[in-house]
Amino acid sequence: MNLKPLADRVIVKPAPAEEKTKGGLYIPDTGKEKPQYGEVVAVGAGKVADSGQLLEMQVAVGNKVLYGKYSGTEVAVEGEDYLIMRESDIFAILD
């Protein structure tokens, strides 16, 4: 299935949660922190300004991004988990 976000929305594939600590201990599902970074898999066309001008997106497919802990809406498509969020919910692009 091909996902195409609308307007200034971005679809992000979150990074997998850590399975074990640096010391080698396994983390149970209830103790795992949700990752706050992931890879952009789709972007919308951009936001329309009050003047009617289309503002281009600053993120692109393939960018690794950092976002807030509670950013976006979680969705599952064909067994894969994604986050749909506005571009303004993204804090930074990781190099």
UniProtKB/Swiss-Prot annotation:
The keyword Chaperone applies. The keyword Membrane does not apply. Its main location: cytoplasm. It comes from the Bacteria. One of its GO terms (molecular function) is unfolded protein binding. One of its GO terms (biological process) is chaperone cofactor-dependent protein refolding. CDD domains: cpn10. InterPro entries: Chaperonin_GroES (IPR020818), Chaperonin_GroES_sf (IPR037124), Chaprnonin_Cpn10_CS (IPR018369), GroES-like_sf (IPR011032). HAMAP family: CH10 (MF_00580). This is Co-chaperonin GroES. It comes from Chlorobium phaeobacteroides (strain BS1). The gene is groES.
